[in-house]
């Protein structure tokens, strides 16, 4: 078992906190000193109280799911002796009312596009199976109620990449 943490810092400054006219911008700091500007989503709290250039919790949630999936996929591909050259994804999360009537991130769809090289290329079915296994192993996906879908995008670099699955 391991513990994971982060530091968050928000300062009011001279803002009108009691009038609900204050910036939601804050800093996230992670081990190693990486700092990320964070804010509420402009879809939730209007600009200028939100900073659209900063990462919002909803984006971070979607990115965490996609990142975890990526890391597991790479590990699985390496163990199966498939050489991955690149992995790109543009995951999309949908905020909607859940079965309890509460706003929640109800679906996150991953759309990974993976390029392989070498003499041993996976078939589309093997790629789909590796994504399925990556999802099953992902700690973040195993920690949430959100439906996580994976819709791989096939391009050059898979065996028989012209096959639709």
Protein language model features and the residues they cover:
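Extended beta-strand/beta-hairpin segments
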Residues: 1-63, 71-165
């Amino acid at each position: 078992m391991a513990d994971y943490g982060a530091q968050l810092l928000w300062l009011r400054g001279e803002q009108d906190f009691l009038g609900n006219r204050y910036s939601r911008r804050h800093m996230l700091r992670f081990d190693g000193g990486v700092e990320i500007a964070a804010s509420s989503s402009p879809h939730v709290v209007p600009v200028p109280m939100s900073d659209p250039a900063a990462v919002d919790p909803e984006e971070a949630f979607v990115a965490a799911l996609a990142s975890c999936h990526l890391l597991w996929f790479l590990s699985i591909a390496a163990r199966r002796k498939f050489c991955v050259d690149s992995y790109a994804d543009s995951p999309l999360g949908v905020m909607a009312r859940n079965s309890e009537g509460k706003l929640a991130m109800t679906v996150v769809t991953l759309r990974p596009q993976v390029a392989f090289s070498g003499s041993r290329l996976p078939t589309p079915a093997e790629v789909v199976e590796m994504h399925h296994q990556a999802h099953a192993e992902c700690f973040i996906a195993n920690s949430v109620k959100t439906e996580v879908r994976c819709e791989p995008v096939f391009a050059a670099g898979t065996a028989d990449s012209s096959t639709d699955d």
